Every structure is written in structure tokens, then in C-alpha cells.
Amino acid sequence: MKEYRVYLERARSRQQDFLYPLIFREYIYGLAYSHNFNRSIFVENGGYDNKYSLLNVKRLITRMYQQNHLIISTNDSNKNPFLGYNKNFYSQIISEGFAIVVEIPFFLQLSSSLEEAEIIKSYKNVRSIHSIFPFLEDKFTYLNYVSDIRIPYPIHLEILVQILRYWVKDVPLFHLLRLFLYDFCNWNCFTPTKKSISTFSKSNPRLFLFLYNFYVCEYESIFLFLRNKSSHLRLKSFSVFFERIFFYAKREHLVEVFSKDFSYTLPFFKDPNIHYVRYQGKCILASKNVPFLMNKWKHYFIHLWQCFFDVWSQPRTIDINQLSEHSFQLLGYFSNVRLNRSVVRSQMLENTFLIEIVSKKLDIIVPIIPLIRSLAKAKFCNVLGHPISKPVWADSSDFDIIERFLRICRNLSHYYNGSSKKKSLYRIKYILRLSCIKTLACKHKSTVRAFLKRSGSEELLEEFFTEEEEILSLIFPRDSFTLHRFHRNRIWYLDILFSNDLVNDE
């Protein structure tokens, strides 16, 4: 953050429209190199030097301005106007430069907003992606209906660029961004396919995620505004939104479109118990009352995406279900509300009564089938869940092989300890344990039984099952901690900030 502030003040001292000149500064690409998300994008492929040239970046930007984009041809995508350069390499360089430049002012605005609101400490506490589950345990047991919503992707990247223009008033920067999308990302047709957008998101993940997050933020800001208009209660949220030109005017215009519905319908059906949570492109909307309001919000969501963001969405893609009969998936868990029925015998004088008590409990379960698919994709087992060896790791030492398997097993235990039923988690540990043994046996060119008998590795491999219990025994008092309690209780670790694919966990 201090580095961002220094570079921003240096740019502000030069001229008022500071974003565009930053594209041509050497330290911007040095900053992108130090924040490359664990992947060295500034190392070219074979046949190129292991460093980039800022002079080549400037030359490519100049050539982008010289291209004629008024004539669109089907053969344009096969032409490479940047002969003599590694186009993919410099495409990633300029993409990272764009992402760094547009991130700088928003990092500073976010920091100043949090300081003014005096919520920096609480903001750090809710950064964990698992902080949502204690909220679900407290609130969802009192709710009856849930809607599982997948936020649709925009059909054209131009929509993402236009949304960003409401935040940053720098015309040359956005003009250069469009030229970049045309030249490097094959954005040379009026209706790009999903495949082209998917390719752009994989080759330029930082820039695409930045643009997509602004799209989601814009959608959520309008949703929160409409919700506040339909309820007299104050909305409590951890979201932080920034002021910008034409922001409220655009919101008010949207309210005028739905003024009839809000004026005559919603005031008679107030619902203070509506809850909304989101992670990445998936959100959950839950309510306590009859599903009338849920259908109303479904109607508003679809019209909001179609009329305001030009994103087509079918009504059948948003389902409304009862929580007691439907399970929803969020952050790698399957969650549903289970009804617990118990009978209590009550005696009053000579009469005896049987009272049936129904209580609700939120069940959060480990999805065993998706996890086995991930293990099979990473070559730890087959599609049926039978453990197999990992020959790729056979060149490492025994200690490194065991440590790799333990690291994956430790991360899975850390992430899924909030499950109410840990039987599936123990099955995953069992698969990893046998895969580790088979990998060691493959390295020593022996059978599993002969390897275990010769090396006596049973005690060492027991760490797959005992390490987590030893850690928890240090946290809880020994007199109150039992293995049975560990199996049944849920433990949420609020230090998990993101989740990686199991395949990339090596």
C-alpha cells in the first residue's frame, strides 16, 4: 500500500489525468512483477531473453494506434501486426500494466474509506471466506426459502469497460484499453463467443477479474439500493462502495422504471428477514416469509441483468426452494436445514402429555463426489476413488514425498473441519494415505506390503490421522477435549483467505 501511495503521488505531481501516463512508466511493470500471483509472466518462452523491454512495450502501443479498426475482416485474427515480438508475452505484460494502473487509486480509496469508518480491525476479521458460515448457522435456521443464483457473465467485454468508466474519468486510458482488447485478445467482432471471453480470462486473469469484480459491484450496489427502497429497516452490510459521478442519478433512473411495482406492491409485503450472501459469481438469497417476495426479487434480478447490463438470463435459471427440502452449494460445502424431531413426556397431576418438539439445524457437509473428482484429476486416485501412485513425484526423497501428501491432507483438514459429518473427510485422508504409500513403493520398486514391512513406515504415515487431533488438543483443555467431541463439533478457521484448485496445490 505504501508503494502504491508513493507512485500515485509521483504521478499526480506530473499532471491531473495521471492514469494514462502510468502505462509508460518502468516502475509500474516492476510493481506488476513483484505482485504476479505466484506465476512469472515476465519470463518469455524459449528463444527469447529472460527479461522484457519497456521500449518494445511502447512500440507495440504505438502500433496499436496505427491499426485501422473500422474495417473488420474474418481473417484479421490470423494476422500478427507485431512481427519480431512474442505477442503472447507482451500481451501479458500490457495486461498486467493495465491491472496495476487501475488498481492503484482504488486501493487508496478503499484504505481511506475504511479509516474514516474506523472498521479496519473488523474488516480484517471478516476477510476469511469461512466467516460466512457462522452467519449462516445463526440466521438460516430461522428462514424457510432459499434461492440459489448464478450471476451471469456479460456477453461482451465492452460492458465491463463501460462500467469501469463510471469510476475512472480518463478517456485516453480507456481508448488504449479498447485497442489492446482488439489487437491482443481478438476482440474483432461485434458478438464475441463465450470461448473467446473464456480464453481472455485465462490468459489475462488479473485484468479480467478486476473488470468482472466491478461488474458484480455495480450489480450489488443497485440491488442494495432497491432493497433499501423496499424496506424501512436499515441494511447492515460489510460492503464498501465509493462515490462517483452519475452514480446516484443512474440508480434513481432505475427506480423510476420499477416505480409502479415498488409503490403499490412492496409496501404491503415488507420482509425484514431477507438475507443475501455471495462468493465470486454465486449468491444465495434467503427469506422467512412466503415465496411471494422471492418471486418478486427473481423478477427484478432478471430485468436488471437484461435491461441494465445487456445480459440475457432465463427465469428458470433461478430456483426458489424450501430450505428443509433443498441443499445449496457454497464454498465447497453442501448446506441444508435439517428438522430434528423429539418427543417430550410431560405430566400434570394425573394426566400425561406427549409434546413433539421440532428444532432446525444447519447441516454443512463435505461433498465427497466433487472431491474424489479433484483427486482423480490430480492423479491421486481413479474416478471410482481407488488410490493410485503418483509416479511424477517418485524422483523426490521419501521425506519430500510424505511432506507433499501431508501438506495437501493438512490443507483439506483445515478447510473442511467445519463439516458436521467428518466421515467423508476421513475417506479423503485414507485415499491420500494409500496414494502416498503406493508412491513410495513405486519409487523403491517394491510392493506396498513389502515396503511397509521393510521400512516400518506405519507410524510415520499415522500423521495423516493424528496431526489434526494433536493440534486441537493444544487449543482446548485436555479435561474437556475428547475424540468424540472432535468428530461431532464444527471448527471454523478464520485465517483462510482464498482456496486453490487441488491440482495446483503442488
UniProtKB/Swiss-Prot annotation:
One Pfam family in the UniProt entry: Intron_maturas2
Principal subcellular localisation of the protein: plastid
UniProt GO BP: mRNA processing; RNA splicing; tRNA processing
Top-level taxon of origin: Eukaryota
Molecular functions (GO terms): RNA binding
GO cellular component: chloroplast
Family in the record: Belongs to the intron maturase 2 family. MatK subfamily.
HAMAP family (alphabetical): MatK
Name of the protein this chain belongs to: Maturase K
Species per Swiss-Prot/TrEMBL record: Trifolium resupinatum
The encoding gene: matK
